[in-house]
């Protein structure tokens, strides 16, 4: 390496010893013993080192696979309640990755089947959050798909193969990583066929999509264009083995409780032996979901072959007010903690009183949106405060109580100088 220098009227002009650019062509030139390096070359060196570290990094040891109890404990940190669903998911996920670690066949020649998962639960009960948390914990690629946007190949809409393409995008088209990933397909109940009798008319977004998903979920080698490019037919397609990908399908299945109730009621007998229940003894939706059988899903509109590809079923219960209050306060990424962290960046403390949390939960219950509606309620309550706070001087604390949630008063602003204490804009 030689140090290129050139004398000028104002002194020596310095050059990067690696790329040859002058000090005027770069933002920073770092000096060493008889050599110089510019900021651009430093960035390039860092990129090279990062790539080499990736290549020599030891692959995840199979023994690092967390046990079902460890998976459940991790889910508890982020998802409130749904204990049965967590246990079912923990066992299914553990068995899936154990199968990948040891191969599809045991030493005795027993073939291990693939156990995809069906989540049944009301809107906002935590189906998506459970799937996301699992993927984050296991450090595997994760993608979501909306079943309502999927259509059969050849029709306007999103092809089923696009799901795998999205998964590849999440891991920079690394096929090996994608094959260890998790795919969550939401609103799966929306692709039920319109009746339980096969129709001669084309059901583009119903039974047809179920048929298209069959092979993908069960396991096939999907051909996906690199970078999603169909514009260049000469490019070689990437081959992805979907038998190694864990598929989790979720849906609210509105009306399924009626199907289950009808079956249960039919099986209880008639006349003197009938199981007569009073209004107070009527089963809740959550109770009925726990009794779901494959035949109920068939009657709902899922084809038997599709149900067979989702052998593990986990039902989630409707969240009550107490659970919603816990969701606001307890998880690692609880909403109150998130907004407190946002205001902390302005050096302002945020306090939610207990009665405020109950009021937020009550509003969410009235909207029938479960935990999903909590953020919009909190966002609306704090909108004006977050708008004005960056321009305000001397505010040290914001207090939210029940009256603020109900729109009866403004958030209480506490100033460093208590004499300037004010409520809202007053």
Curated annotation (Swiss-Prot):
Listed under GO biological process in this entry are:
cell division; proteolysis involved in protein catabolic process
Name-wise, this protein is ATP-dependent Clp protease ATP-binding subunit ClpX
Q: Which UniProt keywords apply?
A: ATP-binding, Chaperone, Metal-binding, Nucleotide-binding, Zinc
**Residues in ClpX-type ZB domain copies:** 4-57
* Top-rank taxon, per record: Bacteria
The UniProt record lists the keyword Metal-binding: yes
SUPFAM superfamilies for this protein: Glucocorticoid receptor-like (DNA-binding domain) (SSF57716), P-loop containing nucleoside triphosphate hydrolases (SSF52540)
Keyword field contains Oxidoreductase: no
SMART domains, alphabetically?
AAA (SM00382), ClpB_D2-small (SM01086), zf-C4_ClpX (SM00994)
Subunit record text = Component of the ClpX-ClpP complex. Forms a hexameric ring that, in the presence of ATP, binds to fourteen ClpP subunits assembled into a disk-like structure with a central cavity, resembling the structure of eukaryotic proteasomes.
Q: What does this protein do?
A: ATP-dependent specificity component of the Clp protease. It directs the protease to specific substrates. Can perform chaperone functions in the absence of ClpP.
**Cellular component annotations (GO), alphabetically ordered:** HslUV protease complex
- Which InterPro entries does the UniProt record give? AAA+_ATPase, ATP-dep_Clp_protease_ClpX, ATPase_AAA_core, Clp_ATPase_C, Clp_protease_ATP-bd_su_ClpX, ClpX_bact, P-loop_NTPase, Znf_CppX_C4
Q: Which GO terms describe its molecular function?
A: ATP binding; ATP hydrolysis activity; ATP-dependent protein folding chaperone; protein dimerization activity; unfolded protein binding; zinc ion binding
Q: Which CDD domains match?
A: RecA-like_ClpX
Disulfide feature: none
Q: What's the family?
A: Belongs to the ClpX chaperone family.
Q: Which residues bind ATP?
A: 122-129
Q: From which organism does this entry originate?
A: Photobacterium profundum (strain SS9)
Q: Which NCBIfam families match?
A: clpX (TIGR00382), PRK05342.1 (NF003745)
Phylogenetic placement of the source organism: Bacteria, Pseudomonadati, Pseudomonadota, Gammaproteobacteria, Vibrionales
Positions contributing to Zn(2+) binding: 16, 19, 38, 41
